Amino acid sequence: MKLFVCFLLLAVVVVSAVNASEEMRLKNLLKAVERDETPDECVTRGNFCATPEVHGDWCCGSLKCVSNSCR
């Protein structure tokens, strides 16, 4: 009986550790996706989006690159 309880406790610890590492990996992936603000090529206008640090807005009215002030 003690062996079964020890095995069950060990299984809970292993599953919890795997779950925590997977959750951390997904959080880091989400942060990387949210942090990626690289402008993509404009579809409507056919030119590249402006750099937000230099030009402010990217490409207002295009299908891909729209900054917050353009929405």
Curated annotation (Swiss-Prot):
Originating species: Scytodes thoracica (Spitting spider)
Propeptide, chain numbering: 21-35
Domain notes from UniProt: The presence of a 'disulfide through disulfide knot' structurally defines this protein as a knottin.
Predominant localisation class: secreted
Function noted in UniProt: Probable insect neurotoxin with ion channel impairing activity. Does not show activity on 45 human receptors from 9 families (5-hydroxytryptamine, adrenergic, dopamine, muscarinic, histamine, neurotransmitter, opioid, sigma, and gaba(A) receptors). In vivo, does not cause paralytic or lethal activity when injected into sheep blowflies or crickets. It is noteworthy that both sheep blowflies and crickets are evolutionarily distant from prey species.
Known tissue expression: Expressed by the venom gland.
Name this polypeptide is given: U5-scytotoxin-Sth1a
Keyword field: Disulfide bond, Ion channel impairing toxin, Knottin, Neurotoxin, Secreted, Signal, Toxin
Gene Ontology CC annotations of this record: extracellular region
Cellular location(s): Secreted
Signal peptide extent: 1-20
